[in-house]
Amino acid sequence: MKSLLRSTMALALAATFAHAAFAQEALIRKNLAERLPDFPKIDEVNKTAIPGLYEVRIGTEIVYTDEHGDHVIQGNIIDTRTRRDVTQARIDKITAIDFAALPLKDAIVWKQGSGERKLVVFADPNCGYCKKFETEMQQVKDVTVYTFLIPILGGDSPDKARNVWCARDNATVWRDWMIKGAAAPRSMGNCDVTALQRNLVMAKKYRVTGTPALVFEDGKRVPGALPPAEVEKQLVASRGKA
């Protein structure tokens, strides 16, 4: 009987706290929407470890507010005890991608050395930073690189992506273009380019809006290019977590 009573009380308390949390979130959403009509659509409101401070997630961005939505704070929270960037850690979690779920069959694949480590790159054939990154990746050993072509920069990017993808040895053609500037031969005849469309859909799903964008085995994603030493560091770290 006592056990049943304790269980009932615990459930009642849990329901009370849940209702209070929902009411607080609703108040914050309401006040921000009414007071800031141009405020972006809110995806989540979560209580933080700091009393009275709430996290507001807008897509992959984080801002903070008080319990009434009276103030909005932009910036990163640093835990001075651990020197941990709490905000960045949260963003890393939000933006993480399940590496195992990526459709690698739609990627151009090349490797160096054993290829035991893996890296995904979203790239546009006209992306200057992608070319620099591809060139510098020659310094990184024992890695397999999966490149998803996403022609998002306009101009002749779609044509170049098609020419590369349809080449018999698209990995060699891709690297020759990115590193040496040797244009891919024009694609002639029938070629299934639906993979390129799927890549664009996937990029939109994961909110990849610029190139290059990197994804490591542990799901960590990095917008933009990294120098070889930092790529190496991230590859080692991702193998430890994957």
Which residues does each PLM region occupy?
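Short, flexible loop motifs at catalytic/binding sites
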Residues: 214
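Alpha-helical "lid/cap" subdomains adjacent to substrate-binding clefts that gate access
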Residues: 164-182
